[in-house]
Amino acid sequence: MDVKERSNQFRFFSLGGGNEVGRSCHIIQFKGKTIMLDAGIHPAYQGMASLPFYDDFDLSIVDVLLISHFHLDHAASLPYVMQKTNFKGRVFMTHPTKAIYRWLLRDFVRVTSIGSQSSNAEDDNLYSNEDLIESFDKIETIDYHSMIDVNGIKFTAFHAGHVLGAAMFQIEIAGLRVLFTGDYSREIDRHLNSAEVPPLPSDILIVESTFGTATHEPRLHREKKLTQLIHSTVNKGGRVLMPVFALGRAQELMLILDEYWSQHKEELGSNQIPIFYASNLARKCLSVFQTYVNMMNDNIRKKFRDSQTNPFIFKNIAYIKNLDEFQDFGPSVMLASPGMLQNGLSRDLLERWCPDEKNLVLITGYSVEGTMAKYLLLEPDTIPSVSNPEVTIPRRCRVEELSFAAHVDFQENLEFIEQINASNIILVHGEPNPMGRLKSALLSNYASFKGTEDEVHVHNPRNCYELDIECKGVKVAKAVGNIVDEIKRTEEEVVKPENDAGQSKEGIEEFTGKTQDVRKDAEGEGAIISSILVSDEKNFDLNLVSLSDLREHHPELSTTVIRERQTIQVDCKKELIYWHICQMFGDVSVLIDDDNVTNTKETKLETSRGMLVLQIMGAIRLTVQHNKAILEWTQGLISDTIADSIIAILMSVDSAPVSVKKSSNSCSHGHEHATPILSQPSETDKIKQVAELFKTQFGDSFTLILNKDDDNDTAEEKEDDEFVKGLITIGKNTASINFTDMCVVECNSNPLKGRVESLLKIGIDMVSSLC
């Protein structure tokens, strides 16, 4: 699957978990980066058939693999990917997930294999214990809320609330943010917090759809119903089988039962009705729950602090590794893994207890299509034996389903999706019918946005179907180095607080209003900062750096400074060249003046090289000696423009009319000619010329007020009208100009004031005499 590296196409590809629950594995690609999300197995199948469709994708191009949590349908094929394929990327999961994953996968290798029905089972396993150990050492851990950057792929883990260590990942590539929820829960239960909403917005949301549009009962109602079902069954002498995953929901259910048994000691306690947890992993993983108790909710942490004992050391629950330790006499409650009843202790107990009508099988988790747990919910008359499928066992026991699966229901999912507010939603981890109903419900919910910029697109791709979405990430440049201080100084100059000591309340309010107007004007105009924008195409970073900091912050960049040099033949005196340069440019520094051309020395040097060296606008060095003018400067946009202007002056200085007039004063003979004296332009004419410049710049926002003497005016009025006024009004910003003195009288906007003063300076130069 080829993806153009600089394309704006976001590609989503499910290798598993598309329109199904099980073997979750998704690929996302953007800007040449590839991320794999989860690597599970399908609990309804065995061996190679349980794997995601890895053959349909080149795993060698995967940069990062993120595991959301330790459940087998999300993590069990990870050792296969790392040891049996051409995968070369890095693998990340949270600390609790890695701690539990080790024990869970070791048990999976022991219990489940591709060749469980064959004599060569060990050779046919998906992977061995050695593969598991070797791959385990390569897995990297990530803390919640810490951002990891892997070659331009930035991702952050947030609490998902599904099981201990479960995480949802917000991934950012080139400004595009993708949120992958994994399995998540928005309900605060007895030991876990609810899933978090990331603070930063996401453009694409990949979200589970396990329960579709179904709605859960309130948790307290479910707990009450659970204890009532169990209590009534054991009171009648029956046994209760609760198939559970070894870790996760099992601990939640045990917290409920342990508390209930303690509250009903007379009837149930003191081993009258025993509770067993049949799992080889229980004791091994108990230390993990002890270690990470501070990652759980306030309720469990409070119990830990108050009692100084681990809440997961249960008083009324005993652990057994296998059925050889179990004395099956009288009523009891058994929590046994695996949760899908495909094999193991839970399947053995099912076959033993299902013929007795007094017994109860209580399904508390989600049942995947094709598993015994799902089949049992149909209440069949018989079930096949796991050791010999041709042998059937009568089913007379009761079967009840009471979901304690830590997955969101429709209302919780909808509220979360609305908070994320992504423009594209991709549904995963759901059977076709529930997922289809959820898609229809979401489209109906967002129907009012259809055809607008805020339209929300909902996708439910099947496995091995390529979904392409046109996306454009938001590019944000980060200022680094000295440029940061320059930006701060500029911001301070835009809005400078005035000294408000002794101001009245009205004065303070007026100043505050003016400050807000200035800020608005500054935001509109924008402060101009000169810097270099450096783009790291590999990591998708944009940095604003000053030229002086370039080598420090980007040593990988090579910089080149180009010096320009131009030589021009001139046939005029240095005095004339200097005069023209001074008339054109305001910043002219004299570096060397051997002949005192600039009249800056009291006497001329006795021995002169005849050299005149000028520094013009701080950028151009002009050397005039004999009949040659040499220009030297560092190449740049502004310096090149100034150099072009100087060259134009030097090329025309000897033929310009003003040069003839200027040089004619030095003639040796002096006689007067009757030449008419031309009238000089009046001050009013000059003001009108400058006012015309303002009219061109500001249009109808500018008004010129020419005061005329009136015999009826009082002395005070005549004194006020001594200067010609100009008024500029732009929204709430005003500027009053004194054209007589060519200055700004009053202005409530610093940016506007700066612009007016610049125009006044240009106007003064424009009407000033060249002679």
Curated annotation (Swiss-Prot):
Give the UniProt subcellular location, in the record's own words: Nucleus
Keywords in alphabetical order: Endonuclease, Hydrolase, Metal-binding, mRNA processing, Nuclease, Nucleus, Zinc
Family annotation (Gene3D superfamilies): 3.40.50.10890, Ribonuclease Z/Hydroxyacylglutathione hydrolase-like (3.60.15.10)
The residues responsible for catalysis, as annotated, are: 407
This protein's source sits in the domain of life called Eukaryota
What residues does Zn(2+) 2 bind to? Answer: 73-74, 183, 429
- Specify where it is mainly localized: nucleus
Please tell me where Zn(2+) 1 binds in this chain. 69, 71, 162, 183
Q: Which InterPro entries match?
A: Beta_Casp, CPSF73-100_C, MBL, Metallo-B-lactamas, RibonucZ/Hydroxyglut_hydro, RMMBL
Q: What class of enzyme is it?
A: hydrolase
Its GO CC terms are: mRNA cleavage and polyadenylation specificity factor complex
Q: Which PANTHER family match?
A: CLEAVAGE AND POLYADENYLATION SPECIFICITY FACTOR FAMILY MEMBER, CLEAVAGE AND POLYADENYLATION SPECIFICITY FACTOR SUBUNIT 3
Q: What family does the Swiss-Prot or TrEMBL record give for this protein?
A: Belongs to the metallo-beta-lactamase superfamily. RNA-metabolizing metallo-beta-lactamase-like family. CPSF2/YSH1 subfamily.
- Say what the protein does: Component of the cleavage factor I (CF I) involved in pre-mRNA 3'-end processing.
Q: What is this protein called?
A: Endoribonuclease YSH1
Question: Per the UniProt entry, what species is this protein from, by scientific name?
Answer: Candida glabrata (strain ATCC 2001 / BCRC 20586 / JCM 3761 / NBRC 0622 / NRRL Y-65 / CBS 138) (Yeast)
